Design a protein with these regions (language model features):
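Alpha/beta-hydrolase fold catalytic core
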Residues: 2-58, 82, 291
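Conserved HGGG/HGGXW glycine-rich cap/lid loop of the alpha/beta-hydrolase fold
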Residues: 45-95
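Conserved alpha/beta-hydrolase "acid-adjacent" motif
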Residues: 235-243, 275
Length: 291
């Protein structure tokens, strides 16, 4: 097999992304058509959304480089049987156009808030994966009344929540490394302007390489019940994960005090990408927690 990427410091992070892209094509995708879809003008850009089903609103926030279909295609058919599912594609992702607007978690969370305003959704349960989980944390901190229950899948509220090799993975990467990749094919399939590909990747790599920290004190102030789902080998620093759970009121002894309202689930033998592919497991956790 021809070696496309050279250098040990480059190969591992590229493989991480390649696996992430691969899941897009492994997914059967949702078989449903959205009951509603469109663009919301918010904070100077137009954010794409899709709505499925009826019931209590449930907002889904995808991971970096992902789309609604690629991230949530296996879950939406089941979730939308009992919930009004609102899936959003963030700046530059999927159907949402690229913008040279500064990309940061606070702005992305504000975009989600704007979409909820547009759809007249006062509050909702929110589920975020990876980058989407960080956005969900930010939304909960800045607009706590928006979030009834929060589900965080393989994500963190600070850079040091990742193991060092993950936190530094994107710093040496360049847009040209993604040429002719499955990610490029997925982008070309739905992006409003395919010529923005290189700018999008460059923007995302800069965003992912930027350190962030929403503050332990802000996490401790979250009053919404939180479910954290992590793969045991998903790249999250498990010491920091335990601290996060303690900040949310967990990690004690429920034999001696009431069970905390926030929960932690560590799925065995799963990576960052792999845990998201465990649709049945995730649906089971969501069903129990979101009731």
């Amino acid at each position: 097999m021809k070696r496309v990427f050279k250098g040990p410091h480059v190969l591992k992070p590229v493989l991480i992304i390649a696996m992430l892209c691969f899941t897009v094509f492994q997914s059967n995708g949702q078989q449903l058509k959205p009951a509603d879809s469109g663009y919301v003008p918010v904070n100077g850009i137009k954010v794409y959304y899709e709505v499925y089903g009826e019931g209590t609103p449930l907002v889904l926030l995808h991971g970096a480089f992902m789309t609604i279909e690629g991230n949530w295609g296996q879950l939406i058919p089941e979730l939308s049987k009992t919930r009004k599912v609102i899936a959003i594609e963030m700046q530059g992702h999927g159907h949402t156009p690229y913008s040279d607007r500064k990309l940061d978690l606070a702005t992305l969370a504000s975009d989600v808030d704007g979409v909820m305003n547009y759809l007249k959704v006062d509050s909702a349960d929110v589920v975020g994966y990876s980058m989407g989980g960080s956005v969900a944390y930010q939304l909960t901190i800045k607009s706590p009344k928006r979030v009834k229950k929060l589900v965080i899948i393989s994500s963190t509220y600070k850079s040091t929540g990742w193991a060092p090799q993950i936190a530094n993975a994107f710093k040496n990467m360049k847009p040209e490394m993604f040429a002719n990749s499955p990610m490029k094919t997925a982008y070309d399939a739905v992006a409003p302007d395919k010529t923005k590909w290189t700018k999008f990747i460059d923007q995302m790599l800069g965003f992912l390489a930027t350190s962030f920290d929403m503050g332990d004190s802000n996490i401790a102030k979250i009053t919404s019940p939180v479910l954290i789902i992590s793969g045991d080998n998903d790249g999250l620093d498990k010491v920091e994960l335990a601290k996060t759970y303690q900040l949310l009121g967990g990690g004690g002894s429920a034999d001696m005090q009431p069970m905390p309202k926030s929960h932690l689930a560590v799925v065995p033998s799963q990576s960052h990408v792999g845990v998201m592919m465990q649709s049945g497991t995730i649906l089971g956790y969501l069903d129990g927690f979101l009731k």
